[in-house]
Design a protein with these regions (language model features):
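Ser/Thr/Pro/Gly-rich low-complexity linker/stalk segments immediately outside membranes or between
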Residues: 26-38
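Structural alpha/beta surface segment adjacent to cysteine/selenocysteine redox centers
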Residues: 63-66, 71-154, 215
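A short beta-strand-turn-helix
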Residues: 40-57
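Envelope-exposed proteins and targeting segments
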Residues: 55-58, 89, 106, 191-193
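Residue-level signature of catalytic and energy-coupling elements of molecular machines
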Residues: 59, 67, 163
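Hydrophobic alpha-helical segments typical of transmembrane helices
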Residues: 45-46, 77, 148, 179
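Soluble periplasmic/extracytoplasmic beta-strand elements of cell-envelope proteins
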Residues: 58-61, 92-95, 194-196
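C-terminal cap of thioredoxin/glutaredoxin-like
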Residues: 1-29, 64, 151-219
Length: 219
């Protein structure tokens, strides 16, 4: 087994030991702004947010980089969400990564090692290029996943040596674990994507905009 394989497996083991949660089974561009208090919202230090922090509706999205349904939402539904709800100040949007497996952990570590203002654009790139790095799409091995993720990180400005060090580092593991722990404890998150609208969680995005509109109208 290669060194890179051991690095990836080591990341997974450390996260499990730290309390990270994983869902069994596998089912445009964004801007990061500073997190701010909003009604019914308890921020985590790692949150990435957009929109009006004083909005009457707070939307928290829990998504996994390896989740095809999450990618579908981010690529095909998020542009409308941003244009009609976030940019207009109707809602306060919070993005959180929820780990389903080791590939998510490696991807999230790389996202966190980039400058904060590149986190969401890299996350967007992960979804857009999911077929190039996620084993569900035929990437044959941990080494293949590693190489593909390092390449994507390189496109975001991180050199390969820094990417390898980032993946091997344990510095972000507690923060990564905390997101999963918090989601399970507060909202019983057990699948991705899950959307929490003013404290009410629902997996998937059936009637998504209808739910937002009802929350905005107070129904």
């Amino acid at each position: 087994m290669s060194r890179k394989t051991w690095i990836i497996l080591g990341v997974m083991a450390a996260l499990i030991a730290g309390g990270a949660y994983y869902v069994l089974g596998r089912d445009g561009g964004m801007q990061t702004v500073a997190a701010a208090p909003a009604k019914g919202y308890e921020p985590l230090p790692t949150d990435h947010t957009m929109g009006n922090p004083q909005a009457k509706v707070v939307l928290i999205e829990y998504a996994s980089p390896t989740c095809p349904v999450c990618a579908n939402f981010m690529l095909n539904f998020f542009p409308k969400l941003k244009r009609d709800y976030i940019d207009t100040g109707k809602i306060f949007y919070v993005y959180r990564t929820f780990l389903r497996g080791p590939d998510d952990a490696v991807a999230e570590k790389l996202a966190r090692c980039l400058p904060k203002d590149k986190y969401m654009s890299f996350t967007d790139s992960l979804f857009r290029n999911q077929s190039k790095w996620d084993y569900e799409f035929g990437v044959p091995s941990p080494e293949g996943v590693h190489a593909a993720l390092v390449k994507l990180a390189g496109e975001a400005g991180m050199n390969a040596a820094d990417a390898d060090r980032c993946i091997a580092s344990t510095a972000e593991e507690a923060a990564i674990s905390k997101v999963g722990e918090d989601g399970v404890a507060k909202y019983a998150i057990n699948a991705t994507p899950t959307f929490v609208i003013n404290g009410q969680a629902q997996a998937g995005f059936e009637d998504f905009f209808g739910r937002l509109d009802r929350a905005l109208s107070g129904k």
